């Protein structure tokens, strides 16, 4: 089985700049293959092994979902009771709680995270009205679980989820002893410590064998009807739906249950094929996802008849269409934690626009979509304390209604080729047309 796995992994690491890759396959509750290649620490020349833990990024979400569902089965919380902001736990688990996109990371062991998540934990749409991937929704789930059980998420997940499955080394934490060093896309090491306001969305650590086992054994923890509800996925695209903490394939082909994860120095994925009794985990210690994807496609292509990448990889891009807004100027504000920040937008010929905020202006291409009148990204710094921490780019996504452009402004950073991965901060935005 997978006799050429070593050569495939070596090629993927070389072609895509991944220091290491760890792979595991489990069948009916037993690990049947576990291999690791490359270096867990390039500076110290420490090899990766099958016992090396890796950061999981968003593959943490299925663990948090399992903890919430266990608490529900124990009668400690109700998946359909409205909670913070009016969203139910079921809606939050499905990323349908109405909360916008967000992530924040603080690197190193010292100091406190610089971004307070509270001002960003707001509704951008009515709960239940649509899908939007929301780390802060999983932050709220962690709070709900803690209020219901009296234990913080990490402790409860260890005692009621991971421990009962025999996965004692699997954890939610700010660091993990012996873990693979995380590396930027150009090979620089990240600091060992990592903190965020959304640990239940992002701060899992595990070895590949542990993750492969979790991906197929979590239903043992739940009542049959709850396990079935986890896989009751609402469509998010042609080939995928999102259930309670897992992506679930749709349409023709094998049933696949999966979740990927990516952040600074992390590209991870877990996939199970319940009808075959198989699960696979692939972990790497680089921001770039290409090596992970190449290895995963090879393994699943060999083991799962009918596998196609679109059955596990959500595509959140929205097709563009030509801009229909006339040339002219718009003015308004971005609502930031400090208050309203002035913003001006000038529509230019050739599907371009000039954006001005504070003392910075930039011209960039813009486009429309079926739901947005205008979207674009500009190399301008939103002049707020939070954005200055690590979000030097400003994206705008605006719809047109009743003569006004409304939507959101996203302060973020493109990748980690300079410094480390920054934060993604969503702000309400409203502009009105200026007289010509």
Predicted regions and their residues:
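Short, conserved catalytic-motif segment at the N-terminal edge
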Residues: 1-56, 76-80, 108-110, 114, ...
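Short amphipathic alpha-helical segments
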Residues: 2-10, 158, 317, 331
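Short, surface-exposed loop or secondary-structure junction motifs
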Residues: 30-32, 41, 85-264, 268-269
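Short, hydrophobic/aromatic-rich segments at coil-to-beta transitions
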Residues: 252-258, 325-331, 350-354, 369-385, ...
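Short, well-ordered beta-strand elements
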Residues: 269-271, 276-286, 408
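Short, gly/Ser/Thr-rich active-site loops of penicillin-recognizing serine hydrolases
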Residues: 283-344, 349, 411-436
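N-terminal glycine/threonine-rich, aromatic-flanked beta-hairpin/loop signature
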Residues: 336-371
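Contiguous, well-ordered beta-strand patches that form the walls/edges
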Residues: 358-404, 414-415
